[in-house]
Amino acid sequence: MEIIRFFLIILMWFLIIGFSCNFIMQTISYSFYKSAKKINEISYEPQFIKFNDTLTGYGYNLEKPSDRVILFFSGSNYIAYNSVGIYSGKFDCTFISADYYGTQHSKGKMNLKTMQQTATELYDWAEKEYPQAHIVIMGHSYGTGIATYLAGVREVQSLFIAAGYRDVSDLYNKMVPIFWGPLRIFISNNIQAAEYAKNVSCPVYVIGSDSDTTLNASLQKKVAECFNNSEIKIFDDVSHEDYLSL
């Protein structure tokens, strides 16, 4: 009986640690979008967009005639305003980013389902507003998972991934290295990009860097292998935050 009691205690603490670590990591990840502030120094003036009564975001070159529209899904801290303000003018076409439900001015609760909903509703709005344009999906870091999801459920011209991951355990394990193998079961709202990749039929371009210490070059090679039709480019001296500055 003592042995059984001992193992039950171990199991109890194992579960407590697993679920607690997941809660902490998810809270941190979401806080980057919920609590991020607008940056003061921007290169391009973002235009506020209300996609529907509860979903908002920003865009640039919204009136510019173009055969392409870029839908951008950002990494941590790069809310829609910041993404558009820093990166949008580097592209000679319409550039749009939405804030996930439950963040910034978008109402509701942030979770996996509403992040996916954000993506599809952003796409549907863009398709309606720009019916003649090809839609290109771009994702960076945390945003690459939802970008991959969208490319698998909607028709897009191409998908660009900068510093991607296979599921969020690749991110969580950088800080709390416990979510390996079957222990990934503790992760709630897991963005399973490797599974989404199986549904992507458009050309995919994966970008990494030997200088990226957050989501490294070797991981990007594994990410590229998840797709049926992908190309990969590894740079030498690009940091994790600077891919779109190339």
Predicted regions: what is each one?
Residues T54-W125, M138, G145:
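Membrane-embedded segments
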Residues V84-G85, A193, C202, N216-E225:
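Short alpha-helix in the alpha/beta-hydrolase fold that links the catalytic acid
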Residues Y130-S141:
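Alpha/beta-hydrolase fold nucleophile elbow
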Residues T144-Y196:
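Hydrolase active-site cap/lid region
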Residues D210-L215, H240-E241:
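Acidic catalytic loop of the alpha/beta-hydrolase fold
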